[in-house]
């Protein structure tokens, strides 16, 4: 809350000082006269044309945008499909069971190997 108040105060003070920097009377000569900038010669080329950046306007392909939007909608609907979610759940469950069975087999193999070593030692 304090930060907001401080920012509002700083902005208000800035506007207040910039608003009173120049007098607004008609007699005052403090205003800036209209004229060319001293460095305006830098922006003119040999053909007396101004050197401005040119920005190419993008050609909008509405069909492509439409296809993209329908593709996003299609992906969202696929994610919400309960049948797909159930299939995914059972696939993940089968993978987990396979990993657990592999770990149990490895544990059994380790126990078998340890028993064999123990029996040979005795």
UniProtKB/Swiss-Prot annotation:
Belongs to the RxLR effector family. This is RxLR effector protein Avh52. It is found in: Secreted; Host nucleus. It comes from Phytophthora sojae (Soybean stem and root rot agent). Residues 69-86 are annotated as: TAP1-binding. Keywords: Host nucleus, Secreted, Signal, Virulence. The lineage of its organism: Eukaryota, Sar, Stramenopiles, Oomycota, Peronosporales. The keyword Transmembrane helix does not apply. Residues 1-21 form the signal peptide.
């Amino acid at each position: 809350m304090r930060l907001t108040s401080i920012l509002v105060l700083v902005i208000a003070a800035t506007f207040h000082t910039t608003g009173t920097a120049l007098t607004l009377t008609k007699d005052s000569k403090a205003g800036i006269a209209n004229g060319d900038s001293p460095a305006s010669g830098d922006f003119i080329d040999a053909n007396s044309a101004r050197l401005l950046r040119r920005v190419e306007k993008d050609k909008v392909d509405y069909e492509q945008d439409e296809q993209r939007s329908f593709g996003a909608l299609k992906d969202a609907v696929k994610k919400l499909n309960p049948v797909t979610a159930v299939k995914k759940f059972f696939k993940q469950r089968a993978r987990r069971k396979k990993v657990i069975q592999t770990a149990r087999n490895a544990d059994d193999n380790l126990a078998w190997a340890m028993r064999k070593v123990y029996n040979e030692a005795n």
